[in-house]
């Protein structure tokens, strides 16, 4: 097996096994292709369903964990008996092919298996974490990253990934924000669609494509206190206007599976939530793929307190619309009895099994159940690594650059100190959810900097801390000495990958351990200090931001993060990432996000009073009286959409094509963008809108468009956006989507804090 006997032997075994399987099945496949040529997809589904026994139907609704390299007798027997429709976590291609052989050749009807895996942001070649990919604001690179991941995963026989994770999250304490696409529904929707397209390709039956799974449906990212699995309470209006939008975009992009969330939504756990999966997903959106539970979440309905036992949990999940159970046997154990008792109609089971079979047919599994890695692109090929590098490059956000400290110049410096626990950490830079990521492929920042400038200047390296959480500071004196002897210092700080992801929420999201103390000690040397931060979430950086000259926020950048960071530090490229989530000043500001409501008492700079400026005996109503915190104000440390460049971009002359448009019409909004700096660079131009008066209160700003443009020094271009009145639609009091006539403000700029604004009016043509 791969990883035990070595890649060469594994390749020989794989080819031999596959060749034998292909010889045995080629004639059968040819006959099957001819027989199915004149049948439509639905006819094929219906015909197969008509041949199935009830036990075989229930088997298709059962997914089994098959992570052991050795195939046990119980699994062989279950697949051969038609009691398994899908396996997950088996990544040895020989084992996968053998399990497919059992399903195709030994089961009565020969129905192939879905093979699932969490391929979240890469397989062997790892892209930046999804939150980092969202910082690219580039659907093309996100799509291609998913495409690379699909091709690599397919070499292991995987045909289904549990991605993209598209939960909106406004709470950086939540560990799974690392897997998300940020806080904004417009940006998340655009990138969700791109990921689905990347995984699934133009035709699911093509070799190297895999089924995508949009998760977690729905509201999981709004967990109370940012604690994973915690309760979520989201009013239906907000649910529809914010949290459901990326899922609708994924469905519109053709995603074939969804995963129900673990969490309790408004009193009903998502796994048992008929409103979500039948009313919204099926009836309103017309989804015809299938829904899978999260790991053992059917059984957990009883733990929530929604049901009394496993049997009632199965009843609730099936009635709600969960087509397949992941990693549990409750469906196998209970469904037949529930049907026999007349509580669940077999017609409902038929419809659910049809959803699963439909995806198997779409994937072409009946024609091509086996995997031959030789038919697919090589793992970690040049294109894959270049895609990972470009994604990392575009994901890094320049938060701060006082006095133009960056980029560093190898010509002007004689030496540079690289200090910190994450400068040379090949595993940590990959981020969370990298079951299959290959650390041998990782190029760390320290090695990349040596490669880029080591021949021109003296590069000195000290880890200084064992890991990001270390409290011992015995190496700090040595770090200070190295810093004093160097012309500039690059600190690699942040959090290890294990501190984010599922079940890894944090109450304090500042730099862990003694990192802030390390920053303070290095600052005292008086040398220019650049902080490069690797993390799986936005962090509160208030305690270090004034002690460093520049900050590059690199997320967990993946396999090629090192070369990307080195290129940015030394000016080979200019940073172009923009924040997909707000950075709070203090954790107590959470949830903090740019598209909040105005309230009846909106804060402004002249209404904010700091806690230290209040007299001890001041009367209660003598100050403020607006929505802010006494100790943090109301603004974030860094706003959504923020990201600096080595170029200087100037926005001016915002215009609309008409001051008034009718419902159903399109408006052109444009502004001039000038590069007044000395270097060519890319900028993400952002369009925001505010609906001033509406059926329900609306956000103070909403992202409605973005474009990534490259501009040479001294050049000016006009950037325009088309804005249709449908783009202004929202769900009102009656939960119906509508666009209302009225006055709108519109902004164009480089972040959500842009002040370049004009306005227009929408009128009812009637």
Q: Residues of each region from the PLM?
A:
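Flexible, membrane-facing loop/turn or short amphipathic-helix motifs
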Residues: 732-734
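Glycoside hydrolase catalytic-domain context in secreted enzymes
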Residues: 20-725, 729, 741-752, 759, ...
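Surface-exposed, short loops/turns at beta-strand junctions within beta-sandwich domains
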Residues: 737-739
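Hydrophobic membrane-insertion alpha-helices, especially the h-region
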Residues: 12-20
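Bacterial N-terminal signal peptides that target proteins for export
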Residues: 1-13
